[in-house]
Amino acid sequence: MTTSNTVYLISGANRGIGLEFVKQLSERPNTVVFAGARNPQAAAELQALSAKHPGRVHVVELKACDEQGNARVVEEIRQKVGQLDVVIANAAICNDVQELLNVSPESMREHFDVNVVGTLVLFQAAYPLMKASPTRKFVVIGAKGGSITLGPEYRSALGPYAVSKAAVHYVAKKLQFENEDFVIFPICPGRVSTDMYLSAQSNDAELAKHPGETPAFSVASMLRVIDGATRENAGGKFMDVSGAVNEW
């Protein structure tokens, strides 16, 4: 069974950018969204969207690095709609705002597990079903702070987060090189006023100087890039919310 709809899977969809992706995609015709959350029962806004768009928004339990759980979600998608066209790997953490000199190994491992390994596990689980889609887009939410060219000179102290984003950028580029029939790329959403960014601002004087855009603005802009993305214009590149190509 397949459908004429475009089918999306969004990780980290219970709040912030992920939730906004679900909101905007759910308003599109011929679109089905599977919204991943660690605790679907507690994701009140996602449940409300599911009730508003029955059969078109599905809330699923999706945890970073959970191989069996990720595979179960993809199998659920296969059984319900028979295809998976676009995955947006949005789930991430940023809960240790300090310079690298003071970062613990445990914090580095936690950020790497969720932000890097979790993204790879999601791709591995989604791959068999995505392979059958003519669209085959796997989009990673990246960050300019993880640019090796730009990030080290930023004055904000986002050590473990930035390092993990640099690593997941490489994962995306390498996956594109290894999978020629996919469109795979990271995209920076810009500074966005999410709970995660506001929390980081409260612990970093430099970040506090830079107010974020609304999630609605950022996601609408990113969707324009994602919609128009091809292997030639975006695959294996570090895209920006503006549509420009960022430096690695």
Question: PLM ranges: what are they?
Answer:
Residues 88, 122-126, 130, 171-172:
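Hydrophobic positions on the long internal alpha-helix
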Residues 14, 18-23:
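N-terminal Rossmann NAD(P)H-binding glycine-rich loop of SDR-like oxidoreductase domains
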Residues 50-68:
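Rossmann-fold cofactor-recognition segment
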Residues 11, 84-92, 115, 140-142, ...:
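Rossmann-fold scaffold of SDR-type NAD(P)-dependent oxidoreductases
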Residues 93, 97-112, 117, 131, ...:
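Catalytic loop of short-chain dehydrogenase/reductase
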Residues 65-80:
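Conserved Rossmann-fold cofactor-binding substructure of NAD(P)-dependent oxidoreductases
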Residues 26-45:
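Conserved glycine-rich Rossmann-like NAD(P)H-binding loop of the short-chain dehydrogenase/reductase
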Residues 181-182, 186, 199-248:
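C-terminal helical subdomain
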